[in-house]
Amino acid sequence: MLHIHNTLTRRKEAFVPIAPGKVRMYVCGMTVYDYCHLGHARVMVVFDMVARWLRASGFELTYVRNITDIDDKIIRRAGEKGESIRTLTDRFIAAMHEDADALGVLRPDHEPRATEYVMQMQSLIGRLRDKGLAYVAGNRDVCYSVRKFDSYGRFSGKSLDELRAGERVEVAGDKQDPLDFVLWKHARTDEPDEVKWASPWGAGRPGWHIECSAMSSDLLGEQFDIHGGGQDLQFPHHENEIAQSEGAHGHTFVNYWMHNGFVRVDDEKMSKSLGNFFTIRDVLERFDPEVVRFFILRAHYRSPLNYSDAHLEDARQALTRLYTALRNVQPSDAQVDWDEPHAMRFRAAMDDDFNTAEAVAVLFELANEANRSGSAATAAQLKGLGGVLGLLAREPASFLQGRMAGEPDKGEGVAIESMIERRALAKKSKDYAEADRIRAQLLASGIVLEDTPHGTVWRRA
């Protein structure tokens, strides 16, 4: 049975969906004003893995990941670029999809844009106003009154006094409490008309937190199974989502909360000021996308993930071992036999709070067994279980020879194969010095030759 670490209760719990056999999951997505960075990559890959495992476990999943396409940063960036909000956000949504596709991330079932749900947000704000949980501040913003929601702070495990003392919160004019947060931002004269919507409280735009409450309830209902996101969103974003949704609807918002850990770079926090900020595109210029996905999945999703070139290179070499086993022992197919002992250990790992670190260890056990036994069935298990994680779907030669998935051999392979043939002729003629010279020449160019029962094959070092 699947168990999930629930951030709300701070313990691992048996997963029981609201509707038997069906799961509804919402994940906070990207604010699209720039290219996605490594933190975004982790969120995308982690919850893609969660979605894949839920479906592999037989659940009928509805997966929603939103897009924030209206925000202070977006307005500022569009002004800097001299382009419309829609032009800017469309461009970065397309870039986000390109990055996600490269990382093997399947599209969610729904990918709502905040600007498409403004009416639903206004309806939710109106409900909060009717219940006395929201008020119009002196600057004409509509704010949520946290002191009116008795459970505020329960999610982050802090009292209101502790939160006021220890957290940096957005301050709006004439708030009743420093922790009160904006539901509706009154229009500013220096902002473009495309970010202004008519409302009962005057022209303006939604605050960040109300977006997710409105989109999730519209697509998944007032209560659903799983809500995910990065650890940085626990407070204030998810605390505020709970206050909004439970305040408006009067009952539990989400049953299981999941948060992935932070990404660090060379053991330091990733930030532009430290000069260690990397976009997904920066990393993919140097490493195969499947290596990046594998690197993310080697760690448990709740653990900190420390990025470095050395760690990515280690991931590349490890993934090479798995693909080498598939190349050496051609699998009969990629169907998983879930009654086989390795598959049972894989399932146990994944059912233990999506423990991909242990699941990946099972893949290496299978690779070692395939290399020892030459069993096509074992190789099929390896390929099939890897596929559950979104790995090992390519032809081994494509990965081992350094080509991207679907990328054709651009002629380099022909030249290398020609040298392999010359080496074979030299060996046949017992000119071992020439054979060794060819091997050394290729190795100097980063090409490793491996003699197998099926002939000589090559891969990148």
Swiss-Prot record:
Complex and partners: Monomer.
Binding-site list for Zn(2+): C28, C212, H237, E241
Sites where the protein binds ATP: K272
Cofactor field: Zn(2+)
Record-given protein name: Cysteine--tRNA ligase
Record flagged with keyword Nucleotide-binding: yes
Family listed: Belongs to the class-I aminoacyl-tRNA synthetase family.
Enzyme class label: ligase
Coiled coil regions, renumbered to chain: none
Reactions catalysed, as given in the entry: tRNA(Cys) + L-cysteine + ATP = L-cysteinyl-tRNA(Cys) + AMP + diphosphate
Positions occupied by motif 'HIGH' region: 30-40
Source species: Aromatoleum aromaticum (strain DSM 19018 / LMG 30748 / EbN1) (Azoarcus sp. (strain EbN1))
Gene responsible for this protein: cysS
GO-annotated biological processes: cysteinyl-tRNA aminoacylation
Cofactor note: Binds 1 zinc ion per subunit.
Superkingdom as given in the UniProt entry: Bacteria
Enzyme Commission (EC) number: 6.1.1.16
SUPFAM superfamilies membership: Anticodon-binding domain of a subclass of class I aminoacyl-tRNA synthetases, Nucleotidylyl transferase
Main location class: cytoplasm
Keywords in alphabetical order: Aminoacyl-tRNA synthetase, ATP-binding, Cytoplasm, Ligase, Metal-binding, Nucleotide-binding, Protein biosynthesis, Zinc
HAMAP family assigned: Cys_tRNA_synth (MF_00041)
Motif 'KMSKS' region: chain residues: 269-273
Protein's cellular compartments: Cytoplasm
Signal peptide: none
GO terms under cellular component: cytosol
